[in-house]
Curated annotation (Swiss-Prot):
Chief place where the protein resides: plastid
GO cellular component, one term: chloroplast stroma
Annotated positions binding Mg(2+): D290, D332
Summary of the function given for this chain in its UniProt record: Involved in intercistronic processing of primary transcripts from chloroplast operons. The endonucleolytic activity of the enzyme depends on the number of phosphates at the 5' end, is inhibited by structured RNA, and preferentially cleaves A/U-rich sequences.
Biological process terms in GO annotation: mRNA processing; rRNA processing
A GO MF term: RNA nuclease activity
Record's keyword terms, sorted: Chloroplast, Endonuclease, Hydrolase, Magnesium, Metal-binding, mRNA processing, Nuclease, Plastid, RNA-binding
The enzyme's E.C. designation: 3.1.26.-
UniProt keyword Metal-binding, yes or no: yes
Name this polypeptide is given: Ribonuclease E/G-like protein
Length: 429
């Protein structure tokens, strides 16, 4: 499957398209984003032994996160968390409207297929990392595997070795920036590190070899993205990539109707083929999805329920990815009389999960047509990003996007750039 990427850093999000359909929406978080690293402070009054957890103060603005003691690294002779202590921690679950961020002290950096973990690196190496070469990093990884591990994803057997080398370079790039900032710490608690490059979160979801074109909002960002790809990815030398840029972010939104995409993504009702529609309702406890046949009819009435559920399953998987729904999800399918139809639906649903790379755990399909499943929450859902308690208030997002200064896109840049041999920068009027 091939993808096209639209990166609009001015508006704080990027989108992943496949065959003219939006697959992912990736938001840039101002604070407590996924994989952000802090030097956190644990006050005495924030330790709760009965809960076996504590609340950690993350920065000078008194933002807090929740950390279970099982995810907190303690010294070998230490049984309890010492009050007023400081830990290097990382965000593994972003905060929602009513829940704080979930933290861990097992620090890691990741790319699409590689996961770099380090929890016990000796301090004598700290002065080496900012200026060390990539091969030296690999050597130290082999010499001290207990302190620095690189874990390979199970799908790496299908990945080109040049892709793995490129991802290793990106890990080294992030690794060096992290330790450079660690050496400059002057006060605690304090925010330490975030992947400031807006392109890196995309590489955590996709392989670069599956991307065709990039769309950015200015020539300067196109040049920066080209420099990043050539510097940190070896595969760029063998593959042609196009980077298309527009005069402003609003011009991109206007061409691709992104405002209407967000508006639709927050509406509870999603229409599919043949009049079938699904209704998505998000509450604090769970997410319910109701399948309705609508005006759909079939010549064979006994196959109507199964056919309706199969069509709705495709839209359900797409909406789970697009809206980033997580937690407990209950799907109310149209009732099916025959057990063979239920087995057919489950097999088809598992097939959709595999081809769409959605990490979902199926629990059971009850006799009344309720499919129970769970999905681990990491990023915020689209509702949490815009802090909409009631999803019917989708006009808030619509007004927010349209409030962008429409006069910006009138800037005329009378240029047509086609630069370099492997990465082409193309201006779109």
């Amino acid at each position: 499957m091939s993808f096209n990427i639209i990166i609009l850093k001015e508006l704080g999000f990027s989108l992943v398209f496949s065959q003219s359909k939006c697959e992912y929406i990736i938001f840039q978080k101002e604070q407590c984003g996924l994989n952000d690293i802090y030097f956190g402070f644990i006050p005495r009054q924030s330790i709760y032994p009965t809960l076996n957890a504590a609340f950690v103060t993350l920065d000078s603005e008194r933002n807090q996160g929740f950390i279970p003691f099982t995810l907190l690294i303690k010294k070998s002779n230490q049984q309890f968390v010492i009050p007023n202590s400081v830990f290097l921690i990382q965000v593994i679950k972003e905060p929602t409207i009513n829940k704080p961020a979930t933290l861990t002290s097992h620090i890691f950096l990741n790319s699409f297929n590689l996961n770099l973990q380090f929890s016990g690196i000796d301090c004598k190496y700290l002065n080496l990392y900012p200026n060390i070469k990539f091969l030296h990093i690999c050597l130290i990884t082999l010499l001290i595997p207990s302190g620095l591990d690189i874990n390979f994803d199970h799908s790496m057997k299908d990945i080109l070795y040049l892709d793995l080398i490129g991802q290793s370079k990106i890990l080294y790039y992030s690794f060096s920036n992290l330790f450079t900032k660690l050496l400059r710490i002057k006060k605690m608690p304090q925010f330490i590190f975030r992947n400031s490059n807006f392109f890196l979160p995309i590489l955590n979801k996709l392989s670069l070899s599956s991307i065709n074109d990039f769309f950015v909002s200015s020539y300067q960002r196109a040049v920066y993205l080209r420099h990043f790809l050539i510097t940190h990815y070896f595969t760029i030398k063998q593959t042609d990539y196009r980077i298309l840029f527009y005069p402003t972010a609003y011009k991109s939104m206007q061409l691709y109707y992104l405002d209407m995409l967000f508006y639709r993504s927050l509406k509870p009702i999603v229409y599919t083929l043949y009049g079938i529609f699904i209704v998505i309702c998000k509450t604090e406890a769970l997410i319910s999805i109701d399948v309705n046949s609508g005006s759909h009819s079939s010549r064979v009435s006994q196959n109507l329920s199964l056919h309706t559920n199969l069509i709705a399953s495709k839209s359900i998987i797409k909406e789970i990815k697009l809206r980033n729904l997580a937690g407990v999800i209950v799907i109310d399918f149209v009732d099916m009389i025959h057990q063979k139809d239920q087995i057919h639906l489950l097999a088809f649903f598992r097939y959709l999960l595999n081809i769409n790379s959605v990490m979902i755990t199926l629990i059971q399909l009850s006799d009344i047509g309720l499919l129970e499943l769970t999905r681990k929450r990491q990023d915020q859902s689209i509702y949490d990003v815009f802090q909409i308690g009631n999803i019917s208030k989708s006009s808030f997002l619509y007004d927010r996007i349209l409030s962008l200064n429409k006069n910006l896109f009138k800037t005329n840049l009378l240029i047509n750039y086609t630069l370099f041999s492997n990465v082409k920068l193309i201006y779109n009027y």
